[in-house]
Amino acid sequence: ACLDATKALGLDVVDTYVPWSAHERAPGVFDFGSHDPKLDVAHFVRLAAEKGLRVIVRPGPHINAELTHFGIPERVVWDPACQARSPRGNPVMLPMLPVAFPVPSYASEVFLDEASRFFRALGEVLAPLVHPRGPIVMIQVDNEGALYFRDGAYDQDYHPDAIALYRQFLRDKYKSLDDLAAAYGHDPSGADAPRFGDIAPPTRFDAESPTDLVRHVDWAEFHEVLLAKAMQRFANALTDAGFTGIPRSHNFPPGQEATPLNAARVRGSIDLVGYDYYSKASETARAIIARRTSELAVRCEALGVPAFACEIGAGFPPFFPPLDERDSIFTILTTLAYGLRGFNLYMAVERDRWIGAPIDPEGRERPFALFFKKLRAALDRVDFTHLYRRAPVRLLVPRNERRLARVMHAFGPVSAAFFSVAGAGAREACLEDELGLGYPPVVEADTFVRTLASSLEQRGVPFAYVGGEDRDVSLDGASWIVCVSSGGLSPTLFERLAGSADAGTLVTLGPRSPSLGGARRSLLEPHDLERLRSRHAGHEVVLGADPSSVEAAVASAITRLELGTYACDPDFVHATVHEDEAGKARVLFLINGTERDTNARVSVGPGPTEAFDLLKGETFPVRDGALELRIKPKTVRMLALG
């Protein structure tokens, strides 16, 4: 009944966890239905196929799923050899309901081998059901792999296997002891010069100068390498278990930009990086969704894969703040507005430790189900998966700026991702240390980003965020690239920006001119900023953070580059437009995240003559290139333009 109801919602694929802890009876002994019929996951997969559904499998090893120990066997999490370690060598505890537990180490060879053994056993029952022989069309590797939410820069991982990987990371990066010593500000011939074989990672933030920052930024980068290596090990184990010929996915958690997850680094093992979304309807949530989804969308478009939400909330766990149906509808429509092209409804069917799904545990539809039926019909009507949101402006945040914010986080084990989810950033959560620069770098950079984003939104300029790790895929097609610099910029990224400038793209840096490398190492040669001026005579390459300068730069770019705008009145309403392959505007989203009920006016250009609300069935005329209609508080309208 539950599968029938899922199909009736308009969903084509069912996503299922396979919890290691549920299937393990003893070390190396697994039950996939031979003893307990409820554990027959292969039967469930075959039944889904009979119903015309395809299947995504999520075997972890970390699955969360609101399960105790996140689906990892108790014997594994309490095995000292498997546990992540704090700077003092203690287990790293996650204070999670119903019971706190020590999180596994992504570097632990014992843990990685234990997970591989589970995958091999699972492959014996599910690999024969992989497409095209069966309905399994994708497999997810791990889950929200941000160090089990204990992702503070100095929380972990000081496990012996992690320390060994850290030292190898430094060998690979610096090649020689002389280069390592020079990078860390030591005399290579001095008695205190660091050595690859016994160097210890930093255990707290103690930098007092840009030179001191280098080893801290390296430690933050190592976390990214650690996770990427673990994902590769998991992916290899799944391949060895027979899960071949289908894409592998991984879901980044809310606040992913504040974690060590790096989409570019996992690209070798993960085919589809998606995001998870859980939000209360609000203007803050809209801004967060815009930032996250625009970054995801431009990356995925460049890579030729759909921008996918691995989880988008329909309901909530009982130990989280409640999300009602309006919150879920607002979140889903806002993600679509900023470029999402597919989503996994979490949860479609209610279960233990979950409240508010559109289908009850007996397979009966709740009133909430009607929205999803209407949404599927609306998406099909406009062929939404073949439309795209043009974003001629790209706000580029280099990876080293994000690493710097991680190591300067001021709240210890309280994850920076928590602040990000709440709409806060470096201004609220990072140390204001000036490090001898005369200004607080991460705070000033965050202020610059917010000021620029606000100015672009007020004028209705479509833009997207880009992480520096995506510099090789997410900058093509941009008319204006604004790259954040708090005083440092890597030579590699500078060359990429210079190439864009040579191709005619307007390139701006701000709020500071970069005099150091991205990790705050001294540059062998200063950046020649004149190379960024290129074809745009009179263009000021470096833009300060003061609002008046930012406003002037945005106004100038609109005129100079003839940027299209979708300005709204009042300006707390936001518009996004999606075009077809011919560049014709086909779908307009209007978003009101505030508490105010309003009549809004939006400029849509000379083409459209009417707008049809795809969810409510109402038609509105477009007069003189403008559309006027009512938008209720905390709602989104999805309109087909004709």
What are these regions (language model features)?
Residues 20-38, 68-78, 94-109, 153, ...:
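Surface-exposed, active-site-proximal loop segments in enzymatic domains
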Residues 196-205, 212, 216, 230-232, ...:
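Carbohydrate-binding surfaces of carbohydrate-active enzymes
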Residues 14-16, 55-59, 137-141, 248-250, ...:
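Hydrophobic faces of well-ordered beta-strands that scaffold small-molecule active sites
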Residues 2-81, 234-235, 239, 488:
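Aromatic-lined substrate-binding rim segments of carbohydrate-active enzymes
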Residues 3-8, 49-50, 130, 263-268, ...:
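Acidic (Asp/Glu)-rich catalytic clusters
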Residues 77-264:
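Polysaccharide-binding and catalytic clefts of secreted carbohydrate-active enzymes
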Residues 65, 144-158, 235-288, 319-323, ...:
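Substrate-binding cleft/loops of secretory-pathway carbohydrate-active enzymes
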Residues 1-8, 255-266, 326-334:
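Short, acidic/polar
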